[in-house]
């Protein structure tokens, strides 16, 4: 259900801008996307889980804020990131 430590390390390695980078917007958005995808799969079986759905909306909002920040600061990095993650915008 949640993102395992191994999967998180793999995501960090893939999207990090420098070695040991865990706080860049790219890494944060990638981890949030993984969590959002996991929750989306959860809702296919548990349609009435409104408590978790509220958490999903919070994750989507956080991701949107980070993406808006990245687009404002560096549009090339933003475009590359949404292409790599398959996020439509």
UniProtKB/Swiss-Prot annotation:
One of its GO terms (molecular function) is structural constituent of ribosome. Signal peptide: none annotated. GO terms for biological process: translation. GO terms for cellular component: cytosolic small ribosomal subunit. It holds the Pfam family Ribosomal_S15. CDD domains: Ribosomal_S15p_S13e (cd00353). Keywords: Ribonucleoprotein, Ribosomal protein, RNA-binding, rRNA-binding. It comes from the Bacteria. PANTHER family: RIBOSOMAL PROTEIN S15, BACTERIAL AND ORGANELLAR, SMALL RIBOSOMAL SUBUNIT PROTEIN US15M. One of the primary rRNA binding proteins, it binds directly to 16S rRNA where it helps nucleate assembly of the platform of the 30S subunit by binding and bridging several RNA helices of the 16S rRNA. Forms an intersubunit bridge (bridge B4) with the 23S rRNA of the 50S subunit in the ribosome. NCBIfam families: S15_bact. Belongs to the universal ribosomal protein uS15 family. Part of the 30S ribosomal subunit. Forms a bridge to the 50S subunit in the 70S ribosome, contacting the 23S rRNA. This is Small ribosomal subunit protein uS15. It comes from Rhizobium meliloti (strain 1021) (Ensifer meliloti).
């Amino acid at each position: 259900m949640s993102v395992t430590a191994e999967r998180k390390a793999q995501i960090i390695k893939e999207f990090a801008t420098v070695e040991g980078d865990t706080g860049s917007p790219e890494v944060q958005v990638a981890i949030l996307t993984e969590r959002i995808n996991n929750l989306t799969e959860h809702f296919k079986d548990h349609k009435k889980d409104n408590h978790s759905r509220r958490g999903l909306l919070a994750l989507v909002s956080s991701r949107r804020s980070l993406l808006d920040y990245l687009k404002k600061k560096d549009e090339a990095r933003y475009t590359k990131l949404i292409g790599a993650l398959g996020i439509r915008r």
